[in-house]
Amino acid sequence: MTRSPLHRLIFGGLRRLLYLWVRSETINQSSMTLNLDRSRPVFYALPSPALTDLAVLDHECTKAGLPRPVLPVAVGPLQEPAAFFYLTPDPDWLGRQDKSGAPPTLERLVAAVSQHAEEDAQIIPVSVFWGQTPASESSPWKLLFADSWAVTGRLRRLLTVLILGRKTRVQFSAPIHLRELVQHNKGHERTVRMAQRLMRVHFRNLKTAVIGPDISHRRTLVKGLVHAPQVRQAIADEAQRENLPLAKAEAQALRYGNEIASDYTYTAIRFLEVVLSWFWNKIYDGIKVNHIEQVQGIAPGHEVIYVPCHRSHIDYLLLSYLLFRNGLTPPHVAAGINLNMPVVGNLLRRGGAFFMRRTFKGNPLYTAVFNEYLHTLYTKGFPVEYFVEGGRSRTGRMLQPRTGMLAITLRSFLRSSRTPIVFVPVYIGYERVLEGRTYLGELRGASKKKESVLDIFKVFGALKQRFGQVYVNFGEPIRLAGFLDQQQPGWREQDHGPQYRPEWLNATTARLGETVARHLNEAAAINPVNLVALALLSTSRLALDERALTRVLDLYLALLRQVPYSPHTTLPEGDGQALIEHVRSMNLVAEQKDALGRILYLDEGNAVLMTYYRNNVLHIFALPALLASFFLSSSRMSRQLLGQYVHALYPYLQAELFLRWTPEQLDEVIDQWLVALVEQGLLRQDNDLYVRPAPSSRQFVLLTLLARTITQTLQRFYMATSLLINSGQNSLSAEALEDLCVMMAQRLSILHGLNAPEFFDKTLFRHFIQTLLQQGVLHADAQGKLSYHDKLGELAEGVAKRVLSAELRLSIRQVALHRDDGLETSTL
């Protein structure tokens, strides 16, 4: 456009029009500090074609008294119509760019200087930045359009000029003298390449310094995926299977890669940091982070995989935010394809999300591309994050691990273990979860709603509510190599080819998932809402006098301080009264006053919701509650009998709640808890016997409330075993037993007023049945019918009668005995 007087006239008009809005300044270098030789011709190199950048450059040169880039210039006999060129050449008429080619102007300049020993040309690399640096920009709107490493289109550039044009900065760099390069006598082509390389490195380093590093691998990685041997083979197989041309199958693989890969940008990270800082301060009273220093120590030299528990959609944003604020690289986060929505999906992708389909079944090409993508992330050292639970927990419990991502990780590590992999469990605890009411509806039977871009606007409703504090605890890291050394000592000597899938993979992956879940539970952050929910839900009327509730909470705190669950578990500050005041301020408990004081209770709206927060810490209290349960029906028990009954029930509690102790450690922990219960006055020791308090005493009430913490879990166990025994050997399949258990639990919840939908959660029954099979108590025949060992009767009656009241056992047995065909086929 600037090659003729007419073009220069039009360009001048456009520049003046642009500067009706744009304001620019030169940073770092001035015309005085460039050390230009005014007797030698000056050229300007811009990184890529942009008319607005050229106009800003021309304006700043005019202002600084530098030669204008749009005017003709001579180098010996060479006459150039303009004194600028783009390092990336102008696109052709189809919009294509030959990035490997050299700018024609640079080719001619090198030739002219080479042929005329007295000539030289000074090339000044010039960078134009629109807006402030992302690190200093505080406006989220402006950060959306700030300079980035991504290639921008004309519409985005127009919006960038309109939004950021008032703070445009130009940086002139020290000139490159072509004479110095030519004197190396490398020949024409190598000299041109040398000049290009110098400018490319310069532009990249400068851009990194100004807008942050290029942390996106998308532009280079996706194309590289299809050249990996495993993906090439999958492409060939796809072409043969679907009778497609090879190029078409390869194009499909590229589409999969683009669908999956994240597009990390520093500006998006800064945008999210600014927006989320405002958001957290609006809805939360603070974010408490514990044990992050161990991650800061382990991150260098390791491939870090963050494995947080999954309670809310904002888990991923919260963790990335905290890592960034604490000087750690935000991870690439696995997100469900359902979140790849318009606007939101693009922002999440630029913030580090990579998207995965819910199932890979029946699509080997997609599987190959996804596996290779993850393998590339791991081998290049990018931190990664995924949720081993798969989806968000609607009940507040730790869900059974989904092992798909763990299996991919394990196979990638076997394929290349040069970079040690470490899993970092992250427990995220909310005093009030954003989706609480949604979970409540889903637990009551409402269908799960599909995510929509309109859901964003629902967030604004949350700004009027109080959500308390958020607790983020980093758990004990799991070194994958060390884990494999324990599980499969000879794994290092085995031949681990790209397609290697050892026989022990599935079992080892399952154990890895259980280990991650246990480490997550070990890092639990116990908060005031958890403890108040635990106390009130243990009462028959969901209510307690304020003084009584204070005593219960003080007891819980004393027990937890005396027998810490793990070094990574954290407790709330303050005493029982302080905890009550905190929960009251969040409107999670109702109150009624009378002449004797205040009664705190859970109303119908909050009763079910509070089961969510109780379940967050159920595993912490499982063992002391189980010990307390034995004294509801027995006034005294020997240490030997207590140990026997705890060992009988422990495998099932451990499988459901991911308790941390091995069977070998159990006796020591039982003794610690018995000492604590004695010191708190809930039990009395008489030689080898433990004796409960008098039923009329305050201590017995406290013991009863502690025991009721685990009652519903034990009821479910008893339901399943009673149904099995009353059905007889080889009469029920596992699926039929699950259905019967759910219907029975629904009926009992009505009869006994159990206001907890997870009481009849099918997955809990399913996992209990699986554990019975694993323990050898059940056996499935060829037709899938279940038979049981004599141990089941001992478990059902011998142990159950010690921990469940006679009334409850009778009610469960009656429903089990009197079930008929209608019960099996109808809903209750």
From Swiss-Prot:
SMART domains: PlsC. Pfam families: Acyltransferase (PF01553), GPAT_C (PF19277). It comes from the Bacteria. One of its GO terms (molecular function) is glycerol-3-phosphate O-acyltransferase activity. It is an enzyme of class 2 (transferase). It is found in: Cell inner membrane. A motif (HXXXXD motif) lies at residues 310-315. One of its GO terms (cellular component) is plasma membrane. GO terms for biological process: CDP-diacylglycerol biosynthetic process; fatty acid metabolic process. InterPro entries: GPAT/DHAPAT (IPR022284), GPAT/DHAPAT_C (IPR045520), GPAT/DHAPAT_LPLAT (IPR041728), GPAT_PlsB (IPR028354), Plipid/glycerol_acylTrfase (IPR002123). Pathway: Phospholipid metabolism; CDP-diacylglycerol biosynthesis; CDP-diacylglycerol from sn-glycerol 3-phosphate: step 1/3. Its EC number is 2.3.1.15. It is a peripheral membrane protein. Belongs to the GPAT/DAPAT family. The HXXXXD motif is essential for acyltransferase activity and may constitute the binding site for the phosphate moiety of the glycerol-3-phosphate. This is Glycerol-3-phosphate acyltransferase.
